[in-house]
Amino acid sequence: MRFLFGLLKIFTTYVLLLLLLNCSNKLPSEISENNKPSEIIKLGDEAYEKGYFERAGDYYLEVNKYFPYSVEDELGLSKAVDAYYRARKFENSRLAASKFLSLYPESSKAQKVLYFRSKSFCDEIDIVERDQAAARDCISSFLAFLSLYPKSVSKKEAEKSISNAREFLVGQQLNVGKYYLKRNNPAAAIRRFKKIKETTKVSSFLPEVSYRLIESFLLLGLSSEAGSEEEYMRKKFSNSSWTDGATRLIDKSGLD
C-alpha cells in the first residue's frame, strides 16, 4: 500500500510539473486578454534570451493585439522590431516598426526602431531577388534617419551603410555596361558608363568605368573620345592600375 501511495505521489507531482511547464511555455497563439501584458513581455524576453527571436517577436506583438496604446504596448512593439530583425524576418520587423512609428513617433525608442528598420533594408542587399531595390530602400531610409537624428550615436554606421549601398548600385550598373560590351553593343555600354559618371561623385568603381568607356570608344573607332578619357584618367586616377591599363589600351590601338 505504501508503495502504491508513493507511486501515486510521484505521478501527481509529475503531472503538476507538466502543468506548470505548459503554463510557462504557453505559445504566442495561446495568449489571450486574460494574460497580463507584463506576463506576455516576460515570455517574449525568455524566448529572446534563449535565441528564439522569431517566437519572441510573436509574443511581443500579442501585447499590441490585446493591450494597444498601453505602456507595455510601446515596449512590446519596440522589442518585436529588434527580435524579428535578429531572426532575419525583415518584413515582420519593418511591419512592427511602421506600427510603432505611427503610434509612438515621439517615443524615446523611435530612433532605435527607425535604425533597425533602415538596417533591415541594407541586410537584404545580399538577397538576389531584392538586391537593387533593397539598396535603394537602404539609402532612402537611412537618409531619413539622419535627417531626423543628425546627432545620433549611430550616425557613422548609417553613413557607412549608405555608402556601401551606393557602391553596390554603381557596381551593378557597371556590370550592366560590361554585359553590353560582351554582347558587342558598345553604344549601349557608353550610355550606361556615362550615366554612372554623371550620377556618381565618389566610388571605387569609377576608374574602371572610365577604362570601359575607352574600350567602348575604341570599338566604335572614336579615337578622340578615347584619348580624352585617357587624359581625364591620368589627372583623376593617376595611381590607379586601371589608368595604366587604359594607357596600354590606347598604345595598342595605335592612337597617338
Ranges and model annotations:
Residues 22-256:
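Acidic, polar-rich low-complexity tracts and alpha-helical solenoid repeat scaffolds
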